[in-house]
Curated annotation (Swiss-Prot):
The gene is atpB. Key component of the proton channel; it plays a direct role in the translocation of protons across the membrane. GO terms for molecular function: proton-transporting ATP synthase activity, rotational mechanism. Pfam families: ATP-synt_A. InterPro entries: ATP_syn_F0_a_bact/chloroplast, ATP_synth_F0_asu, ATP_synth_F0_asu_AS, F0_ATP_A_sf. F-type ATPases have 2 components, CF(1) - the catalytic core - and CF(0) - the membrane proton channel. CF(1) has five subunits: alpha(3), beta(3), gamma(1), delta(1), epsilon(1). CF(0) has four main subunits: a, b, b' and c. Its main location: membrane. Belongs to the ATPase A chain family. This is ATP synthase subunit a. The keyword Cytoplasm does not apply. GO terms for cellular component: plasma membrane-derived thylakoid membrane; proton-transporting ATP synthase complex.
Length: 248
């Protein structure tokens, strides 16, 4: 009988559901997500400040890396929004890409266990649905801001075209597109961290390394997908449902 009812495996030591909550007046916020997000933002700001404190006409080192990253983000915005309209949206698209990219990589590389908490454990900000849904809702807001800034209140006419019967569907579509991004990002990053945690418990020396390298690649791809599609939605709002010339 002991063969069938032996002690549970080490994987049972993985605990989920424990969170650090902060109570601010009547509001309860997820402390782990805020701390991890602040760490990601601090890393980004540190690299940017170090790379731009002594700008040179011929960039080298960290400045060269920052300029390459800026050109890469500009290419995303230009391709999805269009040559005429992309420049005002580069900061937003760049912020999305950098925050998601750094957050995803932190989930695989950052030694979270070295930062003790009263409850729970730190993890990548993007493995929490609150973060990804917040980013998606922010993209929805930018979508409406782009449309209204371009066409004024006449922007809302598109919701009753070609017939007012489609009003609920058109409204729902504009909210479900960015929300689908949030669930994709959340699911991928959460699954990656759980797989790595299980492998580290089972085979702590060899197997997790190539898996972590693979997840670093997929984390970068997820950041690219989220920022690219967010830029595409903004370009759609600027040019209308017909697509316009946002691929100039």
């Amino acid at each position: 009988m002991n063969l069938f009812f032996s002690a549970p495996p080490l994987v049972a030591e993985l605990e989920v559901g424990h969170h650090l909550y902060w109570h601010l007046g009547k509001f309860t916020v997820h402390g782990q997500v805020l701390i991890a997000s602040w760490i990601a933002i601090a890393l980004i700001l540190t690299v940017v400040l170090l790379g731009t404190r002594q700008l040179q006409r011929e960039p080298a080192g960290l400045q060269n890396f920052i300029e390459y990253t800026l050109e890469f983000v500009q290419s995303i915005a230009r391709a999805q929004i269009g040559e005429k309209n992309f420049r005002p949206w580069v900061p937003y698209v760049g912020t999305l890409f950098l925050f998601i990219f750094v957050s995803n990589w932190m989930g695989n590389l950052f030694p979270w266990k070295l930062i003790p908490l009263p409850e729970g454990e730190l993890a990548s900000p993007t493995n929490d649905i609150n973060t990804t849904a917040g980013l998606a809702l922010l993209t929805s807001v930018m979508y409406f801001v782009a449309g209204i800034s371009k066409r004024g209140l006449s922007y809302f006419k598109k919701y009753i075209e070609p017939t007012p019967v489609l009003l609920p569907i058109n409204v729902l579509e504009d909210f479900t597109k960015p929300l689908s991004l949030s669930f994709r990002l959340f699911g991928n990053i959460l699954a990656e961290e759980l797989v790595i945690a299980v492998l580290v418990l089972l085979v702590p020396l060899l197997i997790p390394v190539p898996v972590m390298i693979l997840f670093l690649f997929t984390g970068a791809i997820q950041a690219l997908i989220f920022s690219t599609l967010s830029a595409a939605y903004i370009g759609e709002a600027l040019e209308g449902h017909g697509g316009g010339d946002h691929h100039d």
